Structures are given as C-alpha cells and as structure tokens.
C-alpha cells in the first residue's frame, strides 16, 4: 500500500502535469500561425474554438476545438496509469490550465472543449451525453453558450445516475466553473445581444 505522502505527491504531480498541458493556448497559437493575428482582439476576446470561428476560418476553429479537447483527454489518460484519482487530478488540472494559462497572463478560454476532453478520458459514455445535449440545444437555439451550459449541466446528473459519485462530483464542480466563466454570455443572452454560432467579428 502506498504511503500517504507518496500518494499526495502523486496527486499534486498529476494536477501540475494536467495544468501545464491544459495551459497550451492552441486557439491563439493557431490563429497567429495562420496570419489572423490575435484572436483575443475579436468577438468575445476568448481563445476558444467558438471565437476562432468568428475569424471565418472553420477549419481553424475545428482544429482548435479538437486540440483543446485533446489536452484534457491526454492528461486524464496518461495519468490514469497511476490510478483513477491521478486521472481525476490531471483532468481537473488540464481544465484549470485552459481557463488560467500561465503563459498569457492567466486569461484563457471558458473550458468547454477541455471539459469535453476530460470527460472523454474519464467517462466516454458521458461525452456522448454531452455531445447529444450540445447538438440538440445548438440546433434549437443557434447559440453556442446555452448549448455548452445545458450540456455541462446534464453531465454530472447523468454520471450520478450511473452511480459514479466521484466523477459526478468532479464534473459538478467543473460545471459550476463553466457557468461562472459564461457570466457575460448569460448577460448577453438575456439582453438579446449574444452572437449566434458562426457570426463573424
């Protein structure tokens, strides 16, 4: 049986590993490499896929979405070799790293793609629930933010109903953070000024 000190050090290491991986700002890197400048200067000022889509480059937005998700998936799967607790710590670290990346002044994305990536790494069936909820809401509303909020709200409920209380607790915490990061979007939705999916600028 592992000593408590070693176990705690392993969890801290997994958390730091996840954070470093999650803090890579792919949206910013890709838009600069494509000659589109600083994505933080347009739309919501966010570095995530939805804002990259506002540049009009759908392929770049898709690449950002995939890479931001893979950060979470990779962190969870690699750390899973040291047990589920390490995987949970690394996944949460990746999520926090995306939100608050050290490289760009701790001003990152809103975490939705990385949330999904962590979910794929820890409970792939939950990712299917997330995707279905997101797609249905997006088709009904044509807005990205409520789609993300509805999907992230359903996930911990689905996990809890399946008896996975540890993951349900993790994603409940992450869902609260996602809602906090979407405060401005919620305000714009209420005011009728939120941009629809694919809108430029």
Swiss-Prot record:
Taxonomic superkingdom: Bacteria
Transmembrane segments: 10-30, 60-80, 86-106, 116-136, 166-186
Membrane topology qualifier: Multi-pass membrane protein
GO cellular component terms listed in the entry, alphabetical order: plasma membrane
Root EC class: transferase
Localization (cell): Cell inner membrane
Keywords: Cell inner membrane, Cell membrane, Lipid biosynthesis, Lipid metabolism, Membrane, Phospholipid biosynthesis, Phospholipid metabolism, Transferase, Transmembrane, Transmembrane helix
EC code(s) of this entry: 2.3.1.275
Keyword presence, Transit peptide: no
GO biological-process terms attached to the record: phospholipid biosynthetic process
Reactions performed catalytically: an acyl phosphate + sn-glycerol 3-phosphate = a 1-acyl-sn-glycero-3-phosphate + phosphate
Predominant place of localization: membrane
GO MF annotation: an example: acyl-phosphate glycerol-3-phosphate acyltransferase activity
Pathway(s) the chain acts in: Lipid metabolism; phospholipid metabolism
Entries under HAMAP family matching the protein: PlsY
NCBIfam families, per the entry: glycerol-3-phosphate 1-O-acyltransferase PlsY (TIGR00023)
Protein's job: Catalyzes the transfer of an acyl group from acyl-phosphate (acyl-PO(4)) to glycerol-3-phosphate (G3P) to form lysophosphatidic acid (LPA). This enzyme utilizes acyl-phosphate as fatty acyl donor, but not acyl-CoA or acyl-ACP.
Subunit structure: Probably interacts with PlsX.
PANTHER family, per the entry: GLYCEROL-3-PHOSPHATE ACYLTRANSFERASE-RELATED, INNER MEMBRANE PROTEIN YGIH
Family statement: Belongs to the PlsY family.
Protein name as it appears in the record: Glycerol-3-phosphate acyltransferase
Source organism (scientific name): Brucella abortus (strain 2308)
Gene of this entry: plsY
